[in-house]
Regions:
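P-loop NTP-binding core
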Residues: 1-147
Length: 147
């Protein structure tokens, strides 16, 4: 069975012993990856009923983080339990956002969620920046968003 982030987090929830480094893919560029798949979205449902559900990812990362200078967690664009786990485990956040109107509204919701996580779960969480993506400098909306 391929080791994925979903498998790792499920094992933490079940309090099973595991080699936290098994399944981590190492590359020549000195970048390691923990693969993921659609099972991660299924994990959302399991996290709802898990004990200490906001800290499952933090508990896993605490086993491996000393080996790395940085750990990047690329979340899906939702505010579900996996994203909340990532926010609870993170030191800081970089928010990618498209230079358009509707994604800006989503960012407002995300900022509100980050504030709640900071208040209740992870007091040290900071926002390191906002990364604009898909910027078309020819449009007025993109120009005003960049400003």
């Amino acid at each position: 069975m391929q080791q994925t982030l979903s498998n790792k987090l499920s094992a933490v929830m079940r309090e099973e012993q595991q080699d936290p480094f098994s399944g981590i893919l190492s590359h020549e560029e000195k970048v390691d990856l923990v693969p993921s798949n659609l099972d991660l979205s299924t994990l959302e449902m399991s996290l709802v009923t898990a004990m200490s559900r906001e800290s499952v990812m933090k508990n896993y990362l605490s086993q491996v983080k000393d080996r790395y200078d940085y750990v990047l967690i690329d979340c899906m664009p939702s505010l579900g339990m996996v994203t909340l786990n990532a926010l609870a485990a993170a030191d800081s956040v970089i928010i990618p956002v498209q230079a358009q109107y509707l994604p800006g509204k989503g960012m407002t919701q995300l900022l509100s969620t980050i504030a709640k996580v900071k208040k209740h779960t992870n007091r040290n969480l900071t926002i390191d920046g906002i990364l604009l993506t898909l910027v078309d400098g020819r449009t007025n909306l993109a120009k005003s968003t960049v400003r």
